[in-house]
């Protein structure tokens, strides 16, 4: 029982471990943990070391916006808290509302990448590390990439827009 029984296709393994699993770990722990956990798993499945590192680091490029339970948004914007709290007296928005809006805009910017990045990365992986060294071998898995993008982005959008950046870091990645 293991990843080999789910799929022997390296492209599928890269998506499941490098994209979905690493994004979940980013939401739970953040701070570089996804690459530290996912890359050795890809190595154990027979990926070249450089390919495993590149896959994990590039796929982890946009889940970091929500980071470990929303830390980059909630803590990163904390210097604005006094300004926003002062604005509440004038009828402005609260710090929590501001963080939620930032999370919503973040989600909107990431949704296209949830579909583009997997296709590009599989093409890159097969071009430079595949047995046939062709882009088309990776691009031929575009249907699986679209499915993975939907599994990632639909819950991502719903959770970020309804629950906020803290929960947006985790819940949608479980669906992936």
Could you say what each language-model-derived stretch is?
Residues 1-3:
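Hydrophobic transmembrane alpha-helices of multi-pass solute/ion transporters
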């Amino acid at each position: 029982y293991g990843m080999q029984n789910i799929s022997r296709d390296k492209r599928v393994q890269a998506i499941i471990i490098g994209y979905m699993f690493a994004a979940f770990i980013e939401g739970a722990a953040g701070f570089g943990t996804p690459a530290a956990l996912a890359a050795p798993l890809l190595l154990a499945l027979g990926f070249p070391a450089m390919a495993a590192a590149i896959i994990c680091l590039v796929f982890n490029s946009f889940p970091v916006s929500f980071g470990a339970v929303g830390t980059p948004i909630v803590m990163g914007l904390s210097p604005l808290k006094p300004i926003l709290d002062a604005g509440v007296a004038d009828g402005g928005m609260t710090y929590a509302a501001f963080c939620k809006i930032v999370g919503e805009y973040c989600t909107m910017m990431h949704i296209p990448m949830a579909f583009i990045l997997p296709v590009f990365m599989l093409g890159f992986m097969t071009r430079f590390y595949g047995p046939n060294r062709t882009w088309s071998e990776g691009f031929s898995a575009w249907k699986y990439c679209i499915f993975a993008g939907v599994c990632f982005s639909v819950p991502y959008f719903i959770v970020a827009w309804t629950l906020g950046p803290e929960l947006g870091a985790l819940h949608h990645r479980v669906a992936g």
